[in-house]
């Protein structure tokens, strides 16, 4: 998970690697542009209470709902050729219908094929967390994983690798295979400037 294997390979051998080829379980395209990402677990804890007797007490679910709304109102960074996205993929919490939730958590991620946009999204997350801080709620953020996006490589070497991969795919699978973007083991070598394709 989180490209740990590829990170270890590059940590030990990057200076000796001229090009990197990853064989994934798909044959529909050649992936040669890296989409980076950051994934978080955001947890809210409050005093909670009974829905009638303690009405008005802060709910952990409400805290995360406020954060989710703020995240979905954010403006995305604009970069030439860059695409940036975000998603709250899961929210869970509470114990029963008549209990004000004491605990809730959500999973949030953002992705981009532009390194500056990834950095901007990280800063935006920190700003949103600060702006939505509440005195009667504790919010914790746990980084679950980070993947870098690709940076510029030697254009001629990268093009040669892409051409060879497309030719091999066409020979064995048929048809013209487009160059695509994605999140693969190639993220790591591409982020180090090593020509790579998957």
Residue ranges and their predicted role:
Residues 1-37:
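Acidic/histidine-rich catalytic neighborhood of metal-dependent amide-processing enzymes
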Residues 25-32, 41-45, 49-198:
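Metal-dependent amide/peptide-bond hydrolase catalytic core
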């Amino acid at each position: 998970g989180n490209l740990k294997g590829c990170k270890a390979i590059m940590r030990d051998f990057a200076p000796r690697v001229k090009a990197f080829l990853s064989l994934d379980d798909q044959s529909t395209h050649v992936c040669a542009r890296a989409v980076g990402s950051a994934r978080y677990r955001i947890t809210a804890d409050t005093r909670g209470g009974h829905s009638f007797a303690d009405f008005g007490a802060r709910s952990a679910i409400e805290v995360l709902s406020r954060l989710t709304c703020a995240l979905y109102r954010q403006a995305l960074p604009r970069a030439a050729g860059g695409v940036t996205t975000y998603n709250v993929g899961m929210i869970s919490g509470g114990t029963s219908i008549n209990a004000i939730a004491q605990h809730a958590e959500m999973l949030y991620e953002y992705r981009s094929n532009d390194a500056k946009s990834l950095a901007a999204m990280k800063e935006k997350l920190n700003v949103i967390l600060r702006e939505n801080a509440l005195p009667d709620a504790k919010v914790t953020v746990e980084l679950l994983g980070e993947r870098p996006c690709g940076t510029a490589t030697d254009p001629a070497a990268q093009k040669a690798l892409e051409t060879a991969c497309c030719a091999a795919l066409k020979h064995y699978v048929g048809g013209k295979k487009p160059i695509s973007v994605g999140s693969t083991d190639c993220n790591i070598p591409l982020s180090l400037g090593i020509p790579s394709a998957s």
